[in-house]
Amino acid sequence: MPRHVFILFLAWIVPALVEVRADSWSGKSVDFSHGDLCVSPNGRFLQHTDGTPFLYLGDTAWELIYRLNEPEVELYMENRRTKGFTVIQTVILSELDGSDGINRPLINGSPSTPDPDYFKWVDRVLEIAGEKGLYVGLLPTWGDKVDKQWGAGPEIFDEANAREYGRWLGRRYADTPNIIWIIGGDRSGEGKNFTVWKAMAEGIKECDKRHLMTYHPQGEHSSSFWFHDETWLDFNMFQSGHAQRDYAIYRRLLLNDLQKQPIKPVLDGEPRYENIPIDFKSENGRFDDFDVRMTLYQSMFSGACGYTYGCNEVWQMYSDKYSPMIDAQTTW
């Protein structure tokens, strides 16, 4: 190609590319005018009620509601909007700061008495997300409030108050357009946990039939292990976790879920986080961007309906105000 022709070509194509890029990211991440979310007719994917496909592309921000202020939430969500994320996964009753404290979500630590000021803040977080066309994958509580295990606790839920809390949330957020409910929170659905999680889910669904719902299990497990036949579980979520590096974990979890009846969509709601120590041990090294892309490709090319990204520093909204969890290295 003659040099002058090449220069003319660049003069034409470069502004066009810049314009396309600006147009691509100037609007909302998701156009809510296509209607609420639902499961596709073949049971494999998610879509809007008008038939427009929906890609669940999540980011992990478990501690966002508890730890960030409004300017910080605005900054974070704008960053995620420009990157093309469609869902932000976060928690109402967070893990790291318990169920009570300075920014208390509950009065006297009881799920029967939600703090009005805290839930006005939850409302505002949902509103900011909605303004940017972002869904919020909203966990009513982290799992340690049902089953303490390695968490901070305390255990505050039983079958009765879990159902009551679910009904309260369902009534409050039934008309909020940009919610995807996520029951659980890094815990098993076995034993007594089953009845508590089931009651919470059913309580929400009694008052809110608008929104999709799934369950977030502990590492290397799937919601299908306990809840696949539950009518409230619209799609399965598994956690491939932070220890495995090959396809075997997807063969065991994702492919297994795809073969279950009734057919339900499935996605990895917690794959290996970027910059987290492998198997939680710093001497093993850390997962990097290559490892993240590998989990994305393995999920999507195997038939998942979406994918959730996570970063070790971002999920905990780490800053110098807090002690680092899992050897976090930089601020969020």
Regions found by a protein language model. Name each.
Residues 23-29, 52, 265, 274-276, ...:
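Aromatic- and carboxylate-lined catalytic core of secreted/periplasmic carbohydrate-active enzymes
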Residues 1-6:
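Bacterial N-terminal signal peptides that target proteins for export
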Residues 187, 233-235, 240-241, 254-292:
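Active-site clefts of carbohydrate-active enzymes
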Residues 41, 161, 192, 228-233, ...:
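Mature catalytic domains of secreted/periplasmic carbohydrate-active enzymes
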Residues 25-247:
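Active-site mouth of glycoside hydrolases
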Residues 7-16:
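Bacterial N-terminal signal peptides
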